[in-house]
C-alpha cells in the first residue's frame, strides 16, 4: 500500500503510465482536473481560480499572493484527504511537493518524448511547429517559476524525486513495471508513515479553513499537527484570531486535541 505521484511537463503524455499503474496495482487514479473539481466544491472556489493558483505566480497587483497561497492550501488539504486511504496514483501538478514528507509516497518524474509533446500541442492548438516549441518553453518556465515561488526549490532538481523514467528511451509498459517494482519493494505504508500523512491532512485542512475565514489573518498564525494534536502559534496581538482557529481545528476529523502557544514577536 502506497501513494504514487507522477510529475511531467505540459503535454507530457503521462496518462498512459498512470492508467497502467492503476490497472496493474489496483490503485485508484486521481487526476488534477478531478482534484480541482472536488476541491472547488468543498471550499467554494472555482476550478479556474484553483488551477491558476497551481500554475502561475501572483501578478504585480497581487502583492504577496496570499489569495493564491490560500487556494494552494485548499488543494493540498483536498489531495491529502483523498490519498489517506493509500493505494492511489495522482497525476497532476506538484503532487510530489503538496505531499512532501510522507515516507510511503513514491515521487516519480516522467520525462516525455519531446516530439510527442510538440505533436500534442500542434494537434490541440493548430500551432505551427515553431510556435508549439515556444509555447512548451513558456509553460515549462511558468511552472518552474511557480514551484520556486511557492516552495523555494527547482522543479528539475532530481533530489525532489525518488525515481525518473524517460519515455523517449523506455516503453510505457516498461516504465510501469519499473515503478511497480520500486513501490512494492521500498514504499510500503507503516503505522508511523500513516500518522505523518494523517497529520499533513489535518494541518493542511486547518490552514485551508483559516485562509477562507475573512476574520482570521492567517499569515500571522502558524499551525502544526503531530499525532493528531494541533498546535496554534500566534503573538499576543492575535490571540483572538488564534481562538477562532482553535474552534475551526476542533471540527476537523482526526483532531485529538488543540493547543495554543504564544509565539515570540
Where are the regions that the model predicts?
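Extreme N-terminal starter segment of soluble prokaryotic enzymes
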Residues: 1-3
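Glycine-rich phosphate-binding P-loop
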Residues: 5-19
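Post-Walker A helix-loop "phosphate-sensing" segment adjacent to the P-loop in P-loop NTPases
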Residues: 24-30
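ATP-dependent small-molecule kinase phosphotransfer cores
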Residues: 35-87, 127
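ATP-dependent NMP and nucleoside kinases share a basic, alpha-helical "lid"
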Residues: 88-124
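N-terminal targeting leaders
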Residues: 101, 112, 119, 123, ...
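A glycine- and Lys/Arg-enriched "phosphate-lid" helix/loop adjacent to the NTP-binding pocket
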Residues: 111-151
